[in-house]
């Protein structure tokens, strides 16, 4: 089986349907004896340029190992689902399991924010004990 990276963008008004869509698409891949190596829901993000007069979309990234028939079925589902405004399926040489750069940056920002909050809490406690 081959490895694929799949990104699809969902209409922002249909964001509440994304978990069901992810479940349906991952179910189709696993039913065809495929495996999902990475699944990231990037959420609603700004588009680089308007698509169908939309400026935002809900992004989902999947890295899978699946037979060609499962990928063909997935592309057909993307094509006939009106909520999916764009999709891209790329074949990759190896399975990608590490977090994407977007998720890594998000985690780093969260860690920095938590560290800063802990430092300010420690500083305020130290200031209270001096009085």
From Swiss-Prot:
Keywords: Ribonucleoprotein, Ribosomal protein, RNA-binding, rRNA-binding. Residues 104-116 have a biased composition (Basic and acidic residues). This is Small ribosomal subunit protein bS6. GO terms for biological process: translation. Residues 120-131 have a biased composition (Acidic residues). The keyword Hydrolase does not apply. One of its GO terms (molecular function) is small ribosomal subunit rRNA binding. GO terms for cellular component: cytosolic small ribosomal subunit. Pfam families: Ribosomal_S6 (PF01250). It comes from the Bacteria. Gene3D superfamilies: 3.30.70.60. Residues 98-131 are annotated as: Disordered. Binds together with bS18 to 16S ribosomal RNA. NCBIfam families: S6. Coiled coil: none annotated. Belongs to the bacterial ribosomal protein bS6 family. SUPFAM superfamilies: Ribosomal protein S6 (SSF54995). PROSITE patterns: RIBOSOMAL_S6. CDD domains: bS6. InterPro entries: Ribosomal_bS6, Ribosomal_bS6_CS, Ribosomal_bS6_sf, Ribosomal_S6_plastid/chlpt, Transl_elong_EF1B/ribsomal_bS6.
